[in-house]
C-alpha cells in the first residue's frame, strides 16, 4: 500500500533543502496522511486519508 491519500490522491512532494551557502540537497515533504477505518462500498477498510480530506468532511470515520 503506497502512502497516497485514497480520497484526494495527495502524496509526498520532492524539493531541495538549502543550506546557508545555498547548496541544494534533495528532500521530500510527506503529506499529512492518517491511517483510518472508513466505509467504502459498504465494507469497512483501513486506508490512508489526508488530514485535509478528514477536516473537510469528504470522508467519515467508522
UniProtKB/Swiss-Prot annotation:
Region of interest (Disordered), ranges: 1-28
Gene Ontology molecular function terms on file: structural constituent of ribosome
GO biological process: translation
Any single Gene Ontology cellular-component annotation: ribosome
Gene3D superfamilies in alphabetical order: Ribosomal protein L28/L24
InterPro entries named among the record's database cross-references: Bacterial_rp_bL28, Ribosomal_bL28, Ribosomal_bL28/bL31-like_sf, Ribosomal_bL28_bact-type, Ribosomal_bL28_sf
The entry's keywords: Ribonucleoprotein, Ribosomal protein
Protein family membership: Belongs to the bacterial ribosomal protein bL28 family.
Entry protein name: Large ribosomal subunit protein bL28
Source organism of the structure: Bacillus cytotoxicus (strain DSM 22905 / CIP 110041 / 391-98 / NVH 391-98)
Lineage of producing organism: Bacteria, Bacillati, Bacillota, Bacilli, Bacillales
